[in-house]
Structure formats: C-alpha cells, structure tokens
C-alpha cells in the first residue's frame, strides 16, 4: 500500500508494456514507478504491475503499469493482459534490430485485443548504448508516424526520457478522456446518479474507476 497521497486519485489508467523479451520493459517499469534499475537479466515469469500517481493539472492520475514479465517468450500473453488498457508502450532494443523487426507483429496483436482508441508509444530503449545502435532513429520515427504512434528513445539505465515517455502517454490518454467527457456533456449523455466508467470524482471522493476510451 502506498501512502495516503498515493491513494488519492481521480482516474486509473491501465498501461501495458509489450515487446520482445530482454528489451528492458521491466526496468522501464521499475525506473518509472520506483526509480530503480536492476542489472540482473534473469526473467521472472508471470504478469506483474506497479502503480504511480501523477498530477496532470488538478487531476490525480493513478497509472497502473502492467509488465508481461517473460510471458512473451512463450507467446503466452492472453487477452486478459490487454483488457481495459488505455495505453501501451511498445518497446524494442535499439541495439538489436531483430527486436524492432517484430514491432509490427506486436502492434497487430495489441490491436487484435485492445480497444482501437488505445494510445500507443513506440519506445526505442537502451539509448545509452549508442555505439551499439542497430536501429536508426529516423527509421523508427517514420514507422511510428506512418502508424499513428507516439515515439521516443529511452534509457532505463540512466533514466533518459523514461519520465517523459510515460507522462506523454498519460497526458494523451487524459486529453482523450477529457474530450470524451465534453462530448458526453454536449449530448446530455451523462445520467445523474449513474455516471460512466472513469467519471471524474467530486471533492472529497477518493475512489475511481478504470477508464474506457
């Protein structure tokens, strides 16, 4: 359990990490949620998630970050992993081109199981190993642009762009949710007493629903 401040939030956003084994998904998760990095390359089997609450304007957003934790090795990721996700970081290792070559397959699997409105960022991890780079920045950037994805290069080791990557995705999700709520208000779609999932909480309320975009 986090401290009281950690428990006070307006929205919960589920964000999934996907990509090949060994690209640094778990370290991106631990760097963002706990500011930790592990040099131990052993893979833990089983789905896990961590949370961190961030402020976007006056709204407290609880980011629930899910990690496949090795299941991708066995093609054992199920639809339950993607269910309810409103954001995804599709991670590849920019020092191993083979992890980038299968990005399109991961994107297809994501769209097969997740909502079409999910916010997706392509992440080239391990930017600290620039001398070993196998994937040009512009190649990955163009792929992202052509597929409507956000794009950043990160280093979980030295923290470069890790905060920015997660916060950019969360801001994009929040913008979509805010726009959806405005549209609902315009069309009188919100019924008193039975607001939609992910409804913003009033003063003093601390519980929240997961968002569906």
Curated annotation (Swiss-Prot):
A motif (Switch 1) lies at residues 35-49. GO terms for biological process: epithelial cell morphogenesis; exocytosis; positive regulation of cell population proliferation; positive regulation of epithelial cell migration; protein transport; pseudopodium organization; regulation of vesicle-mediated transport. InterPro entries: P-loop_NTPase, Rab_GTPases_membrane_traffic, Small_GTP-bd, Small_GTPase. A lipid is attached at residues 209-210 (S-geranylgeranyl cysteine). A motif (Switch 2) lies at residues 67-84. GTP binds at residues 21, 24-27, 38-39, 43-44, 70, 125-126, 128, 156-157. Its cofactor is Mg(2+). One of its GO terms (cellular component) is Golgi apparatus. Pfam families: Ras. Keywords: Cell membrane, Cell projection, Cytoplasmic vesicle, GTP-binding, Hydrolase, Lipoprotein, Magnesium, Membrane, Metal-binding, Methylation, Nucleotide-binding, Prenylation, Protein transport, Transport. It is found in: Cell membrane; Cell projection, Pseudopodium membrane; Cytoplasmic vesicle. Residues 211-213 form a propeptide. It catalyses: GTP + H2O = GDP + phosphate + H(+). Mg(2+) binds at residues 26, 44, 67. It is a lipid-anchor. It comes from the Eukaryota. Its main location: membrane. Interacts (GTP-bound form) with RAB11FIP1, RAB11FIP2, RAB11FIP3 and RAB11FIP4. Interacts (via the hypervariable C-terminal region) with ITGB1 (via the cytoplasmic region); the interaction is GTP-dependent. Interacts with ITGAV. Associates with the integrin alpha-V/beta-1 heterodimer. Interacts with VPS33B. The small GTPases Rab are key regulators of intracellular membrane trafficking, from the formation of transport vesicles to their fusion with membranes. Rabs cycle between an inactive GDP-bound form and an active GTP-bound form that is able to recruit to membranes different set of downstream effectors directly responsible for vesicle formation, movement, tethering and fusion. RAB25 regulates epithelial cell differentiation, proliferation and survival, thereby playing key roles in tumorigenesis. Switch 1, switch 2 and the interswitch regions are characteristic of Rab GTPases and mediate the interactions with Rab downstream effectors. The switch regions undergo conformational changes upon nucleotide binding which drive interaction with specific sets of effector proteins, with most effectors only binding to GTP-bound Rab. This is Ras-related protein Rab-25. It comes from Bos taurus (Bovine). The gene is RAB25.
């Amino acid at each position: 359990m986090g401290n009281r401040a950690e428990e006070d939030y307006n929205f919960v956003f589920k964000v999934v990490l996907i990509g090949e084994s060994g690209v640094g998904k778990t370290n991106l998760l631990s760097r963002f949620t706990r500011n930790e990095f592990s040099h131990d390359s052993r893979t833990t089997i089983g789905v896990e998630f961590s949370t961190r609450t961030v402020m976007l304007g006056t709204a407290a957003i609880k980011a629930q970050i899910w990690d496949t934790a090795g299941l991708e090795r066995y093609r054992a990721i199920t639809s339950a992993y993607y269910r309810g996700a409103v954001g995804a970081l599709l991670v590849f290792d920019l020092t191993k081109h083979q992890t980038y070559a299968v990005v399109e397959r991961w994107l297809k699997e994501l769209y097969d199981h997740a909502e079409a409105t999910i916010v997706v960022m392509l992440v080239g991890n391990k930017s600290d190993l620039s001398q070993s780079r196998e994937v040009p920045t512009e190649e990955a950037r163009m792929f992202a642009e052509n597929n409507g994805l956000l794009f950043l290069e990160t280093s979980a080791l030295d923290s470069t762009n890790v905060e920015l990557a997660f916060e950019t995705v969360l801001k994009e999700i929040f913008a979509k949710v805010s726009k959806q709520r405005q549209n609902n208000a315009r069309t009188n779609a919100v019924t008193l007493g039975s607001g939609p999932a992910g409804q913003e909480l009033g003063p003093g309320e601390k519980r929240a629903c997961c968002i569906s975009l």
